[in-house]
UniProtKB/Swiss-Prot annotation:
Family, per entry: Belongs to the universal ribosomal protein uS3 family.
Subunit structure: Part of the 30S ribosomal subunit.
Protein's name in the database: Small ribosomal subunit protein uS3
GO biological process: translation
Function: Binds the lower part of the 30S subunit head.
Organism: Pyrobaculum arsenaticum (strain DSM 13514 / JCM 11321 / PZ6)
Chaperone found in the keyword field: no
Top-level taxonomic group: Archaea
Keywords: Ribonucleoprotein, Ribosomal protein, RNA-binding, rRNA-binding
Start and end residues of each KH type-2 domain: 24-93
PROSITE patterns assigned: KH_TYPE_2
InterPro entries: KH_dom, KH_dom-like_a/b, KH_dom_type_2, KH_sf_prok-type, Ribosomal_S3_C_sf, Ribosomal_uS3_arc, Ribosomal_uS3_C, Ribosomal_uS3_euk/arc
GO CC annotations on file: cytosolic small ribosomal subunit
Gene name for this UniProt entry: rps3
Molecular function terms, GO-annotated: rRNA binding; structural constituent of ribosome
Amino acid sequence: MSVQQRRLPVYKKILEENKKKWMIKEFLEYRLSKYGYIDSEILKTPLGTRIVIYAERPSRIIGRKGAIVKEVSNILATKLGVENPQIDVIDVSKIEAPEMFPKVVAYRIANAMAKGVRFRRVMFAAIRQLTEAGAKGFEIVVSGKLSTERARFEKQTFGKLYKIGYDAKNRVRRAVVHVLLKPGIYGIEVRIAPASLQYSDEYKIKPPVRPEAAAQQQQQ
């Protein structure tokens, strides 16, 4: 850390750190999206900066003999000024079904459309995968020149999915991906309420326990 950075006010230090984290995330998504990149966590440690990458296909991100990870680490250190970057790649399938991550679903739709598959066919395939994975609710929106020269959008929804409020902002997962085809740019937006999500208004009322039953339970 330079002398100038040490003299910065606290709020400016926080802004600088958040700006650098955003730049790292943007670079990782740009460089690794075609290899199954989903998300990342950036953690400051006494030994440097630990970057945890969540991926659908970890072996592709690591590369042959770790070539891709080494290249990314070198760019982060030289171009973005990340101090001693240490990259760990985690397979999301060991944590949760990949279909519960909207970025995975959005990239699958984008890649299929880039190969010439019709958008409706891809959307229905994604709907089938999400329902089989047990998603509580989801919404898929594809926008662009779908069937005419004028841009429009098509939306498919399923289950219980909140669009406003605390749950929608902090618990429902959302991702937006763009794909460039011959007619123009298409946007794919995916929102998913994962199977493990419990909404704030979902609760169970326990039936009252009679005093006699409570006394018997204590005796037992």
